[in-house]
Amino acid sequence: MTKYRVLSIDGGGIRGIVTAVMMQRLAARAGLEGFLDQIDLITGTSTGGLLALGIAHGLDLEEIRGFYELDGPKIFDDSWLDDLLDLGKLRGADYKTAPMRRVLKRILGDDTTLGQLKKRVLITAFDMDNEDPDEMKRTWKPKLFHNFPGAGNDRHELAYKVGLYTAAAPTYFPSVDGYIDGGVYANNPAMCGLAQTQDTRYRPTPSMDDVVLLSLGTGASLFHVKGKTHDWGYVQWVKPLINLMLDGISGIADYHCHQMLRERYHRLAPVFPPEVSIPMDDIKKIPYMIRFAEELDLSPTVRWMKRHWMAQ
């Protein structure tokens, strides 16, 4: 049996620092050295897409952690003047694309394509207009950027641009070339990655029995709505609906992967304490998130990896 190892990384904005620190700690554990080298496919959404591109490009985890610690404040840099011009964040995205573009060009290269990456990747985005000349086929649709061989791939796409596409979270950043954050349909892209392993257009296709999948979250806050009946309209629903849908999407992907892979699937999705809520742009919480990730009990994940990921 030849294992096919898939790493899936959720979206979560600046909370990606939690994932970066968790991966650092895992890579430092005895018996797990070089676990990233064994990856066959990395799939990611939003900040998870940036992590996936960085790993596939060959960046070490210290560089990737530095991206969040040093460059995060530049990317999520907002001023009172920007807010004023955007009418208190009611018009226009919160942040400009230019700082993230500069950072991604620096770390991924100006002209590095997906085809030049050292690992297979599957990066989620959403195409706002497929521009099909047939009006009966013109629509918006999910887009999965990948560098698998064969027809229909995206090997020519610039890596930094794909990073911009997957990270263009609505209200936070403008769309880029008509694409927005894949988190609108796959904030947890694990099922996307699993499905990609079975695409018969790309040979050889691994047996499902050979696939092992490690899914990493970025740190979650728990939400709930009290009561049993909610006769609400738009105003009441708009605030909880986004978190409700993102959590639902993530949860159903977790369910599907567990049902299909059983013990060959593992999800590491840490939850912040009940009193802690961290928006995806809260750069002031970076020190807290680092401490949080450094104190997590990773022993269940370490045991699973030694048994299913590292073992031949």
PLM regions: where:
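Conserved beta-strand elements of beta-rich interaction domains across eukaryotes
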Residues: 11-14, 47-50, 58, 128-130, ...
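Extended hydrophobic secondary-structure segments that form protein cores and membrane-embedded regions
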Residues: 6-9, 38-46, 121-126, 208-223, ...
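Conserved small-residue
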Residues: 12, 48, 104, 123, ...
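Short helix-terminating capping/connector loops at secondary-structure junctions
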Residues: 1-2, 33-38, 114-118, 204-210, ...
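Surface cap/lid and interfacial helix-loop subdomains adjacent to catalytic sites
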Residues: 85-89, 93-120, 144, 176, ...
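C-terminal helical/tail subdomains of lipid-metabolizing enzymes
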Residues: 1-2, 171-178, 184-186, 205-208, ...
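Active-site gating loop/helix substructures
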Residues: 77, 83, 115-199
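Patatin-like phospholipase
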Residues: 4-8, 14-104, 161, 293
